[in-house]
Amino acid sequence: MLRLDKVIKPWKESAALNDHINLYGFWTETTFLTKSGDVGMVLNVPGVDYESLDRSEQEYAVKRLEAALKSFGPGFHVYQYLFKSNRPDIPFAKYDDPIVEAAIDQRRKFFEAKRDHLYQVEIFYCILLEGARSKTGVAAALARFFRDPAGAVGEFKAQFTNDSMKTLLRSHIEHDVRRLDQCVQAFVRQLADFMQIEVLDRQGQFTFFRRLLNFDDWRVAGKPQSTQFLDYQVVNSNIEAERDHLRVGDHIIRVLTMKEAVTETRPLALDALLKIPANFRVVTEWTPLAADKARKEVNKRRRHFNMSKTGFVSQMGNDATNTNPRDVLVDESKQADIENLGDCLRALGDGQSLGDFSLTIVLYGRSKAELDQLGTEFAGIFTNADGSLFSETYNQLNAYFAIVPGNYALNLRKLFLLNTNYADLSFLFTILPGEKTNTFLGTEYLAVLETDNSTPYFLNLHNGEVAHTLILGMTGSGKSYLANFLLQNAQKYAPLTFIFDIGGSFQSLTRIFGGSYLNAGQESRDFTINPFSLPQTKENLQFLFSFFRVLIEGNGQRYRLDFKEERRLWDAIERMYMLEPTQRTVSNFTNIVGELKERLHRWTRGGQYGFLFDNAEDTLSFSRFQTFNFHGWNDAPEVLEPLLFYVLHRASNEIADPAKLATFKIFLLDEAWLFIKNETIRNYVVQAQKTWRKHKAAMILATQSIKELEESGMLAIVAESCPTKIFLANPEMNREVYREAFHLNDTELDLIGGLVPPGQMLIRKAQTSKKVHLNVDSVSHWMATNNARDNMKKRDYFERFGIADGLRHLAEDYPFQPRTLATSTSNTNH
């Protein structure tokens, strides 16, 4: 006989999907409430980039986290979530400049085409506090039995189920919320100097919960419609259970749980998880036990193993008084377990804590075959760490629902773990993506690069208010190419750009952006200089005094002015401004400077270098993109020094112009070691690095010779003044000099030594370093390249189509093929 009640019973017990979610609603802007009376907060944890840390730094970071996690004692559930997903958000703003927009648009298309193979890593913590009312409800239910039998029965039932609503008092909830908030704030403060942890608001938590139960972007998007019924609102996908996988919306889900813990934990024990190119969620749950309960659990297991190590038959068949203990067969494995448990007791006595720990991995994609392959890869990681994973089948729904905060009653895969081991397995280390916004300029990032793990890295030169940058690399490592790339991306800020070039590396880029390229070499001069054309200000008079002192004393200061000569020089400079402007020339100046006339003879029209400064007019002017080519003066330092000094002063006046205070400025010294050989120029550069921050200016020094910086005494100064350092390939570097000058550890030195040109670099900012790859699109390449063959093509296309359209046509006709990053697997889940 067919009994309908038996047929529909499983359907009734399965209930609606939201019935399996223990979330109830939002209590405050940052606190959520569960149906069982628990309160919780969700934290966005930026993490620490592990790539450049040595072993001691890794251990220090873990110890800091271990100490901070002690804020959460018995009654807390600490959930940690590691999200890795493809198609990261890479924002690109729109720009009015057609050339800038052409470059940005091509960069946008370049990354859009490869978004399926790019990933992002996110870390979240959820701190859940079990409600105080739920822990004392049995006694309360018995106490109210005679005055309210129905309510008492309902309350009594609610204590033994996790998905039934409980009647809670506001005072109890408020008390729990205050305690939770205090503990979370203590946790955040302990790590405040380490990383900036964000407590998610209502919208952030809603999106987080939806991401746990939905895998399509359109299903995750949305806002909470009410502060209640959160279980109903976050579920936005159907779930179908198959024998060995789930179907959630349009995705196939595989759930793996940790069956055996890693035998010996250490920092970055599971770092291989970060390197797998796949979409997944890794979730851990940690529930600290009270000290007395922890000891009780350990002793219970010690007694069990002690009783079972000799076997029941051996114990019954031997007389304990007459039998030698050495004659009894002992299970050595059980004895080892007893000793390990004894070590655990000693650890508890030393202040460590024991807790329930579980780890769940959720793989998602659209191909079951790919997920099967990934499952094997994940299992291999744990096997190599002496642990093991179990692929869930009949328990997969429980395991999947258990990743939602508050669903701890469904978590059936728990292991005991010490807090020190838990800290090692915590999600602390990550792959930092840089900063998407430049907080100082209030704009988007400077440029997008890529990491070894196929994640985007958003580069900003600024560290706070300072953007001075040092670029170091051997010949052929790509310094000029990188500098061109950085300058072309910086044009999105509409800056004043000044470049001191040697050899014409930036001539093409200057033309592309409509700048002025002036040759200041011996063979060609595009401007004339008259130092006395400067307005009569205190700063300019002081500069002229230093300038003529350089002319008189010569390179290496072969002649030194005495006190009387210094006074005579100053008086002569002041008297020059009594003459008519047309009479203010170097030749006339020598007539009133007295005995110093002979020292200045070679700088007059009748002398060797009179063409440089002895001119009636000064035609030197600055455009928004200004490049000076000093090619040809490398072998004449006595001329290069005053020429640089004058042009540098004029550029500095442009930078310090109060009318341009709101404009960002970039000053690039290519082959900087040639420019700072002279003490006067060095002092000027040092002073500029100290003061240009106030004028919203950044100085970029590109050089291949660290030896020249060291011998000139500039190495320590530049290392301190340039908070951003970009190291390109240099396998023959002096490791000890690099270590001492830039405070690099062995890991960072190894990374620099292993860089492959062109394109690979190590970017060091503040106390962190990141190895990245410069993979350019075709337009960026054609803007940055500067060899003769490419320059001829650019000249032809620019004449035919204009600059903006010419770049687009070059990219279409001669596409550039960027370097392809190697990944551990060829399959990618969408």
Language model segments and positions:
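Hydrophobic anchor at the beta1->P-loop junction of P-loop NTPases
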Residues: 471
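Short beta-strand-centered segment that lines the nucleotide-binding/catalytic pocket of NTP-utilizing
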Residues: 495-507, 522
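Walker A (P-loop) phosphate-binding loop of P-loop NTPases
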Residues: 476
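Extended, folded cores of ATP/NTP-driven motor/assembly subunits in large transport
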Residues: 1-433
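A short helix-turn-beta junction within AAA+ P-loop NTPase domains corresponding to the substrate/partner-engaging
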Residues: 515-518, 714-727
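P-loop NTPase motor domains
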Residues: 48, 55-71, 293-300, 387-388, ...
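Hydrophobic positions on the alpha1 helix immediately C-terminal to the Walker A/P-loop
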Residues: 482
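Conserved lysine of the Walker
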Residues: 479
